[in-house]
Regions:
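N-terminal secretory signal peptides
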Residues: 1-9, 20-23
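Bacterial Sec-dependent signal peptides at the C-terminal "C-region" and cleavage site
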Residues: 25-34
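Solvent-exposed N-terminal domain segments of exported/luminal and surface proteins
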Residues: 34-147
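A short, polar beta-strand/turn micro-motif
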Residues: 65-111, 170-210, 288-292, 301, ...
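Short linear interaction motifs
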Residues: 74-78, 144-155, 251-259
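Extracellular-facing segments of soluble proteins and assemblies that are Gly/Ser/Thr-biased and enriched
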Residues: 109-189, 193-195, 199
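Extended, compositionally biased non-globular segments
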Residues: 197-199, 204, 208-304
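Terminal regions of secretory-pathway proteins
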Residues: 306-318
Length: 318
């Protein structure tokens, strides 16, 4: 794992800057703590990473988050046996509508990035398909106990694409720790970032009554549950969460809709808005868009964890 030097320890108790969301505007926000350059050893030798930086600004009708894609928390180590790539810095802009609009029907995220955190690191939850075949109907759930060990995730539930992009597959633990909300309930709802369709993303706490800011904060649980019985064809075996298709949505469970979100008030949108929730169980990161995602959020690059299936999962049978 790569850490800042003790003499310049990470100071990331909260994202620095000001969010001015009441008028659909965001003032400049800085997410660059005083990290020294960090050494990430690649297959080709050592590379020094610059200090992490992320800036958000309002350019009507868009919000733009520009990042150098360097995590602002401890990460790695990379490469590792399940993920043979190194984190690489490059400037990238993520663009979302400042006034998001719901589409006529939810849209599966497919192999697109779902969104971006305020520290400039993308959310990209999709995993490889069984036998590397997208037509198989079975997609590995990267966060599952049987798939995760072979995909090289670090303790922030993240790993690296072949082009060096560090991205989260589950709750961004390093970011949550730096905000002081990884374990203890927060005092108010915590905005973590934005989905590619522009709707905000919050951590797993929300008001008991969605439209009442005076109601207490409670943990918001997903409505997804494991299917009963065994898989029909494909990898066989019981529905144990190894595959995305092992889950089904049950509207009687939890407080969230199939998009892992709900409409309600938040500290940043006191009049209410649809917002996604990152939960601590499936789907962790939502898998459906409410609105139209912007094209600045890319699809997967083939490599371990995508449909370059890691060797240990290539012939998987339950």
């Amino acid at each position: 794992m790569y850490k800042p030097t003790p003499s310049r320890a990470t100071r990331r108790g909260a994202i620095l800057g000001t969010l001015a969301l009441s008028g659909a505007a965001i003032l400049p926000i800085k997410a660059c703590a005083d990290h020294p350059g960090r050494i990430s050893r690649s297959l080709y030798g050592p590379d020094t990473l610059p200090e992490p930086s992320a800036d958000m600004f309002f350019a009507p009708p868009w919000r733009v988050l520009s990042s150098n894609l360097v995590p602002d928390h401890d990460f790695g180590p990379f490469p590792n046996p399940g993920n043979p790539f190194s984190v690489r810095a490059r400037r990238r802009s993520f663009i979302v509508p400042s006034d998001p609009v719901a589409a006529s029907a939810p849209m599966p995220i497919g192999f697109s990035e779902f969104g971006v955190m305020l520290n400039g690191i993308p959310l990209d939850p999709a995993g490889p398909h069984w036998r590397g075949d997208r037509r198989s109907g079975w997609q590995f759930e990267v966060m599952s106990p049987k798939a995760r060990p072979h995909l090289g995730l670090d303790d922030s539930n993240a790993h690296v694409h072949p082009d060096g992009v560090y991205h989260y597959h589950g709750p961004p633990s390093g970011l949550l720790r730096s905000l002081g909300v990884a374990d203890a309930p927060p005092k108010s709802m915590v905005l973590l970032g934005f989905a590619a369709d522009g709707f905000p993303i919050y951590w797993r706490w929300g008001h008991l009554v969605a439209d009442d800011p005076a109601s207490p904060l409670v943990e918001l649980h997903s409505g997804y549950v494991l299917r009963s019985g065994t898989r029909d064809g494909g990898p066989g075996g019981r529905h144990d969460g190894t595959f995305v298709e092992d889950y089904v949505y049950d509207g009687a469970r939890g407080r969230l809709d199939p998009l892992n979100g709900r409409i309600g008030v938040t500290p940043d949108w006191p009049a209410g808005i649809f917002h996604y929730i990152i939960t601590d169980a499936f789907p962790w990161i939502p898998r459906l868009f409410r609105g139209q995602p912007h094209t600045s959020f890319s699809g997967h690059r083939v490599g371990p964890g995508i449909d370059g299936v890691p060797p240990a999962l290539r012939g998987y049978r339950a």
